Amino acid sequence: MNEDTEQLDIISDFRTFEKSSYDKWNTLYQNIKEDRKFIAGDQNDKVDKKLIGDNVTECRLNVVSNAIRTIVNTYLPNQYKWQYENQQDLTTRADEFLADIDNSTAAVEALQNAIGTGLGVLVFSNDLDIDGNVKSCLYSINDVTNVRLDPVATKLNFADAKRAAIIELKPKEWVEETYGVGSFMEKPLIDIQDNYDHKQYMPLVTYYLKRNNQVYVFRMLGAEIVEQITLPYSYIPVVP
């Protein structure tokens, strides 16, 4: 299989996956969008607003946000730990990893999403520390509706997932400046089911694919794969 054919195979695989994932999780994602507005304080419908009147300043206690904050505060003194039986060295390293301020913050952010809207997503990745050294890190996806989860995974932590994707809508000017990919396409080959402004944006897709017990990640844009990395994992590092 030549490189062009292989790229088209990966892109086709993503398109099939993205549609099936969107179809399965779309109802949840639409509910999450409504819940987020409610949590943010948009809690009055048209009838409520008409009864309140235009000249009345709304002043109310956001019970939902306070309840979420209370549950999170209850969790903080009892944070999740990894423990390995008869492997104290691994347990110590896991404690150090989760105690890192960035990683612990990510865990709390995912918890807030899970409590508030029913879904939080964590991603294992790598980053550079202040000395320029590569370190493992954990980060939370702020807008979980931009995540595509494996629709056929059966385990609670999605440990058996074969695919996942993270979608970022990027301005077309940024696309051209950063990747040199032509932004003239009205309908890019690498696209998503969700609605967005095709004239202004293009989806930048980070696609995780597990084949033969090896995990690959592809950065895709427009009609091409702009980056490909083989990950040192045996699992998809996108964890709901």
Per-segment meaning from a language model:
Residues 207-240:
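Extended, charged amphipathic alpha-helical segments
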Residues 1-203, 210-215:
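Extended, helix-rich architectural segments
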